[in-house]
A protein has these predicted regions:
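Conserved ASCE/P-loop NTPase catalytic core
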Residues: 1-148
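Switch/connector loops and helix/strand junctions flanking conserved nucleotide-binding motifs
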Residues: 4, 14-15, 110-111, 155-160, ...
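Short acidic (Asp/Glu) and glycine-rich catalytic loops that position anionic groups and cofactors
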Residues: 97-101, 162-167, 180-185, 199
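Short, contiguous acidic/charged loop-to-helix segments that flank catalytic cores in large enzymes
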Residues: 108-111, 137-138, 170-176, 192
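Short, surface-exposed helix-loop/turn micro-motifs enriched in polar/charged residues
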Residues: 112, 139, 159, 196-197
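A short helix-turn-beta junction within AAA+ P-loop NTPase domains corresponding to the substrate/partner-engaging
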Residues: 119, 159-175
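Conserved H-loop
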Residues: 152
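Conserved C-terminal "switch" segment of AAA+ ATPases
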Residues: 156, 173-199
């Protein structure tokens, strides 16, 4: 809930390339599932149209908000090759660049928390990520993602102290007391135009 509210704060629009070329490989970045397109549809305006106020090879989007939960595996954090189209699909964290990537229910993925945390050490420290092509090459890409881990496990169950120090902000969100819950409920009901029985 907090991450979604943070995402809904009005922010500047961002531009992303539809595709990225690296070492002769094509990476498909724009994903309509995660990227809310705000410019004209590509079929309506050509890349050379004078009406366009920016380079037509870029797409204007709202900052992305991407969530993955228990289904997350390490291969989802690397390039995915499609042999039919001979094109790579960008991983979730690259699609989340300039936005928020929430790993929800952290510690309950198909891989251990240590493996997931180890995957993020370099990107969190250097603000770059390295992705692997099936031919053996690597692509260095920017890592400008606000990464959020959400968990109901204790921090010591998730990783060692050295890694937890790398996470700049930590927030404990406790369950509200009964009186706090009643107040929250009343406020929400009023905001929706509903009456609340005092009993």
């Amino acid at each position: 809930y907090l991450a979604r509210t943070l995402f809904n704060i009005e922010t500047a629009l961002v531009y992303i390339p539809a595709w990225i070329e690296c070492q002769g490989n094509i990476i498909h970045l724009h994903d309509p599932v995660y990227h809310e397109r705000l410019d004209s549809d590509e079929s309506e305006v050509s890349a050379f149209a004078k009406e366009r106020t920016f380079d037509g090879r870029w797409i204007q989007i709202r900052r992305p908000f991407i969530v993955s939960g228990g289904e997350l595996t390490l291969d989802m954090l690397d390039l995915s090759y499609n042999p039919g189209s001979k094109v790579y699909d960008a991983p979730l964290q690259l699609k989340a660049n300039n936005g928020i990537y929430l790993i929800d229910d952290f510690g309950r993925q198909r891989v251990s928390p240590t493996e997931v945390l180890n995957r993020w050490i370099v990107p969190m420290e250097r603000r770059v990520d390295f992705l692997n092509f099936q031919t053996g090459g690597k692509a260095q890409v920017p890592f400008e993602t606000f990464l959020i881990f959400s968990s109901n496990l204790k921090p010591e169950q998730l990783g060692d102290e050295a890694f937890l120090r790398r996470i700049q902000y930590k927030m404990l969100v406790r369950s509200p007391e009964e009186a706090e819950f009643v107040q929250i409920f009343k406020r929400y009901a009023q905001s929706e135009g509903l009456e609340v029985d005092p009993a």
